Amino acid sequence: MRLSVRWVFFLGFFLCALMLAIAGYFQFVENLEPCPLCILSRVAVLAIGGVFLVAALHNPKSWGIKVYALLGFVVTLIGIGITGRHVWLQSLPADQVPACGPGLNFMLDNFPLTETLELVFRGSGECAEVQWSFLGLTIPGWTLVAFLFLGVISLWQMGRTGGGAGKLT
């Protein structure tokens, strides 16, 4: 049994939706406030999920599959960069952690976008704080694993041909 291209794009979308639901649970139920890098990670997940959903609904053929998969892969690389930086910040010794900076909303309101992004990627103390872990991985660690999986899905889709109308064969 072989999954159609459409179903694989839906699978990628549902993984992104699950990731955002888990992020919402942590924020609104467990009261874990997201740091600026967490928010950027969510934006990347939302973008990848959007690409996968549009691809699944469009059900492209041949080159269209490759275009959507390439777009998803590029956004996945951005997500890997964001979460990789976040994991690195969390692995720093306490004396090397950058000082806490202003919140993302404050930076967006008061600084140009380029300066805001530079400050966010430089990182701050709040981004280095480990608030939760499971099986030895923090939230950014699990997010990095998910981005890697989404990247594999994108690469796999690039190598496939034919869409099919949602068939499992």
Swiss-Prot record:
GO terms for cellular component: plasma membrane. SUPFAM superfamilies: DsbB-like (SSF158442). GO terms for molecular function: electron transfer activity; protein-disulfide reductase activity. Pfam families: DsbB. One of its GO terms (biological process) is protein folding. It comes from the Bacteria. Keywords: Cell inner membrane, Cell membrane, Chaperone, Disulfide bond, Electron transport, Membrane, Oxidoreductase, Redox-active center, Transmembrane, Transmembrane helix, Transport. HAMAP family: DsbB (MF_00286). This is Disulfide bond formation protein B. InterPro entries: DiS_bond_form_DsbB/BdbC, Disulphide_bond_form_DsbB, DsbB, DsbB-like_sf. It comes from Nitrosococcus oceani (strain ATCC 19707 / BCRC 17464 / JCM 30415 / NCIMB 11848 / C-107). Belongs to the DsbB family. It is a multi-pass membrane protein. It is found in: Cell inner membrane. The keyword Cell inner membrane applies. Its main location: membrane. The chain crosses the membrane at residues 9-25, 44-60, 68-84, 142-160. The gene is dsbB. The keyword Membrane applies. Required for disulfide bond formation in some periplasmic proteins. Acts by oxidizing the DsbA protein. Disulfide bonds join C35-C38, C100-C127.
